[in-house]
Amino acid sequence: MKILIDENMPYAAELFSELGEVIAKSGRTLTADDLIDVDALMIRSVTKVNSELLSKANKLSFVGTATAGMDHVNQALLKNKGVFFTAAPGCNKVGVAEYVLSCVMVLAQQHGFSIFDKTFGIIGAGQVGSYLAQCLDALSIPYLLNDPIKEQEGDTRSFVSLDELLEKSDVISLHTPITRDGNFPTHHLIGQERLLTLRHDQILINAARGPVVDNDALKNRLLIQDGFKAVLDVFEFEPEVDIALLPLLSFATPHIAGYGLEGKARGTTMIFNSFCEFLQREERADPQNLLPVAPIPNVTLNQQWDHSTLHNLIQLVYDVRKDDAVFRKEISTIGAFDNMRKDYWDRREYSAITITGNKDCGLTPLKQLGFTIEEV
């Protein structure tokens, strides 16, 4: 059995080699010829699964994407061909939420405001948006939710309209898929008209899909230079990036918000376990068994944590300025966007750090935020 994997999928080679012959290739440059005699295909979001790619897939029976998003896969086509499909919903939710928190924490430090004085607006209440809301709940930070599809489906959470969210939120965080059809398309959801309504003191963060925000309109909005801030982890035409947009952004990164090592391990193991079930094999993988010890695995608190402590803990795990600096330095070189993703460092999640302290340190919110807690 031949299993074709994306060469940038962590732990995939060692796991899938238990099941068959593994062939590793660049996901963005896969061609139809690569799928000849291949039984299973394991991809990431850079691979477009369409009729062209599958035109010579004479043995393909299984496709797995180690990503939460699925807009790069023509699922109807796979179904018509009798090919089983699976994804990894929620695998990156922790990393994306921690990315957003890092961005806002750094901006708070740079511009002299407190994250606790802000209201967040979360657009898209799926796995990622819901986890971000959970983090904000842990810190008692208010937020508004917008997700008309969830609302129509009977989700009992309190939702507001998009226009109300844009009006009342200080930090607007996007967590929708990219859709062009249906009652609530998200392509250019944040376009020129809505961008011009945003206040000078608002922050827009897109860690969802690039085309959810009209990048040309965003550039024009930022050129007003009234204090409005924007952070992009995704770009409308990535891997191509509008270089003229970069100086206007507070932070810019190459689609790595969900690239924590834990998240990537979860994505790989989720599709590995699904493939084992498909094959009726007993093998199962636990992402925790794959992860190395964090560079700084332990932190001790001697007193009640405060805003400064929280800022330091969050930046200890992940400081967005590191990725932003690399992005701005490298992006003008050929292939930089994909190379930065391919060579991305082993970023960890809060759970990789154990915080030790006594009951007077008030550790419960930190535990709810995701840190591992050891009370003494």
UniProtKB/Swiss-Prot annotation:
Family assignment from sequence similarity: Belongs to the D-isomer specific 2-hydroxyacid dehydrogenase family. PdxB subfamily.
Catalytic activity as recorded in UniProt: 4-phospho-D-erythronate + NAD(+) = (R)-3-hydroxy-2-oxo-4-phosphooxybutanoate + NADH + H(+)
Chain residues that bind substrate: 45, 67, 259
Species of origin: Aliivibrio salmonicida (strain LFI1238) (Vibrio salmonicida (strain LFI1238))
Biological or metabolic pathway of the protein: Cofactor biosynthesis; pyridoxine 5'-phosphate biosynthesis; pyridoxine 5'-phosphate from D-erythrose 4-phosphate: step 2/5
A molecular function (GO) term: NAD binding
Catalytic residues in the record: 209, 238, 255 (proton donor)
Protein name (record): Erythronate-4-phosphate dehydrogenase
Entry binding sites for NAD(+): 127-128, 147, 176, 233, 258
EC number: 1.1.1.290
InterPro entries (UniProt xref): D-isomer_2-hydroxyacid_DH, D-isomer_2_OHA_DH_cat_dom, D-isomer_DH_CS, D-isomer_DH_NAD-bd, Erythronate-4-P_DHase, Erythronate-4-P_DHase_dimer, NAD(P)-bd_dom_sf, PdxB_dimer_sf
Subunit structure: Homodimer.
Entry's localization field: Cytoplasm
Single GO cellular component term: cytosol
PROSITE patterns with a match to the protein in the record: D_2_HYDROXYACID_DH_3
